[in-house]
A protein has these predicted regions:
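Alpha/propeptide regions of enzymes that mature by internal proteolysis
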Residues: 1-101, 108, 130-161, 176
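Canonical tetratricopeptide repeat
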Residues: 153, 187, 221-222
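Residue-level recognition of tetratricopeptide repeat
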Residues: 156-157, 190, 224
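Short coil turns that delineate tetratricopeptide repeat
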Residues: 179, 210-214
Length: 243
């Protein structure tokens, strides 16, 4: 496919020389949105797939044969970004009966449409739950958390680009998603200080310090390595927020 061969042609070639094709299940989509899928005749029932515009859903070892149609319907009708739509498909699969063996694991990977050559930044979401009684519930939690971290990272980048207002919008968006995450509140406060907005930072520091004194211990260390101003008056005001 990297050389331009379509997904259907690639799958056809692979299956033609695969002696175990009857027990395979595979789906692929190329950069032009051409979709190909295969469910082997000897895959353990219930097994099957549905392809549509820019997507494929497939399943095997399901409780019943309504699972993948439910996935397709959910994916095509769900609102939101790609991650939201994929989660909707997974939720629908479970609601329709899911894996006959029960619930154990779930994963979600979303990459950018235009690779930059930096795999670590091209992966928008790379989440997995390897063993849980409620894997989809945990995956939902991780997705929200990762969205918040993505906002924090965007805020840090905005700070580097001297876009303070943009940074604060990103930090606020992160806080709205995970309001109880003390680390995000703390680094938001640190960013405010470095923008010269010490007064705005103090309520955030106060909240963090009162919840966990370790952040109070950490704060002078940041000043020593240049991540907070070395001005003792400023540092004193920050530390006093713990009172």
């Amino acid at each position: 496919m990297r050389g331009g061969t379509s997904a259907p042609d690639v799958l056809k070639m692979l299956l033609a020389k695969d002696p175990s094709r009857d027990v395979r299940q595979v789906a692929m989509i190329d950069a032009r949105g051409r979709v190909a899928a295969h469910t082997g005749a000897k895959d353990i029932p219930a097994a099957g797939h549905i392809t549509g515009t820019n997507f494929s859903v497939q399943a095997n070892l399901m409780l019943n044969d309504t699972v993948w149609p439910a996935m397709a319907k959910a994916f095509t009708s769900a609102k939101g970004d790609l991650a939201d739509r994929m989660m909707a498909a997974l939720d629908a699969a479970q609601a329709a009966g899911g894996d006959i063996r029960g619930r154990q694991s779930a994963a979600l990977i979303v990459v950018t449409g235009k690779p930059t050559g930096k795999p670590w930044s091209d992966r928008v979401f790379d989440l997995r739950v390897d063993d849980s009684a409620e894997p989809l519930k945990e995956l939902h939690r991780l997705l929200v958390l990762q969205r918040a971290y993505n906002h924090m990272n965007a805020g840090d980048l905005a700070v580097e680009n001297k876009d303070n207002d943009g940074a604060l919008r990103e930090y606020s968006a992160a806080a709205a998603l995970v309001p109880d995450n003390l680390e995000m509140v703390y680094w938001h406060a640190v960013a405010l200080v470095n923008m010269g907005r010490v007064d705005q930072s103090l309520p955030l520091f106060r909240r963090v310090f009162r919840a966990d004194k370790n952040w109070l211990t950490l704060t002078p260390r940041l000043a020593k390595v240049g991540l907070l101003p070395s001005d003792q008056a400023v540092l004193g005001r920050i530390l006093k927020a713990a009172d």
